[in-house]
Amino acid sequence: MVERCIEIASKRFTDIYRYNISEGLWLAGKKQTKKTPVDPLEMLDRILATEHKVKYFERSLFILEHFDLVLENQDPYLLTKLKLITEWRCHHSAVVIMGRPYLELPEIISDIPKLNVAHIDENDLKEMLSACDPHIPEDEIRDLTDALKGLSILECQNLISLSLAKLKRLDKDFITNQRTSVLCERANGLIELCEADIDLNSVGGLEALKTWLLKRGRFFKGRSPQTESRVPCPKGVILTGPPGCGKSALASALAGSWQVKLVKLNHACLFSSLVGQTERNLTIALETVKALSPCILWIDEFEKFFPQIGDSTLDGGVLSRSLGLLLEFLQSARDGVFVWATTNRLQSLPQEIMRAGRFDAIFFVDLPNRGERTSIFEILLGKYVPEVDLKGRESLLDATEGFSGAEIEQAFIDSLYECAESEAELDEFTLLRTLKAFIPLSRTLKEDIDSLRKWCVSRARFASCSEPFKDRERREPCPMSQR
């Protein structure tokens, strides 16, 4: 980036100086040895002195490298001198401060214009690839350019060199996998790359939701070229319902069906005790997700993301500012990023989040009905004991009334342990005995689940084809659920 800046500046400035706290201040492009380290205050004094000595036709540029490390100390003398430099009346010199992306400047110099240039320009990237292999086809250059997007110049050079060293060629899949690892490491644990080794057929039931997702799959701009340019890219959904009903499993299944990455936002690492660090973490996480597109952004337990959002006196307004950043992200053009937000308490979400336009729909994922439990048993049998035939056993369907999909699977696994200990084959009676001893959450949290179900009647679309209400005609349509 420094070399690129010098290349552009050489057309406008007569002298270009570089500075860092290790090597001092020196004239760029000269062969003489760099000077000994110079104190930042002394360096700023030299810049101020230079302004009064240069001739009217001379212009100097000072590039301060890694200067964000110096600004962290909030030295009042240093900040005051920088402020004096910004208030020059005769602009014979200019100063460029280089630091990490999303640098927050102290208030006294906050009026300095900021430009985030974290990624390499596409034309520069094509030149770099052509220099490695002059005979590379144009379509391969385009694919490799997409595979390297979101990286800095040095990171691109490293991945290209690694591909050539290991495979003796520029391999798109290898570079894409390495790029994903680099971006996730850059996020410092704020996001997590999850496995997406199943598809929508691996999840039992929820046919209405799966049909809705399949209709929008071909319009996901990160996945395939668009023929209908007027149809916008799907933005995302909010899923609510009792725990264990498949909200999280569907995220992995959708990523597998759409053949894109599944990225989980780790809100446990997001919040920090340092002032401004939480907002910075959220910004870094969301920008990294954009760089990883096409992908599905999974925000699990969404209700825990904004606890007590209305009371800003308890946290100094951190949660309110975080909400503002997230709203800006949801409202912006984010083609190639599908947000999958799951929550057990839809009522506790801020109303701004649920406004139409930020998500495509709100779905209520209820406990599986009889037909869905049949599908779940078929999937579990094929997964664990394909040689056993328990299909169509009405007693099992009766015994699992009120069970979630996760509870059915756990009871199934418990039965396998019982059979392994007695060296017997899994049968209907073993499963029934295990199910009888199992206490589902629908019994433990009956009041909470009933309350959530009734609350969602006129506020969400049902993920299953059949609704568990006899008085469906009384249901008022939810404007957002009809989209």
List each model region and its residues.
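Walker A/P-loop NTP-binding motif of AAA+ ATPase domains
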Residues: 1-113, 124-127, 200-398, 403
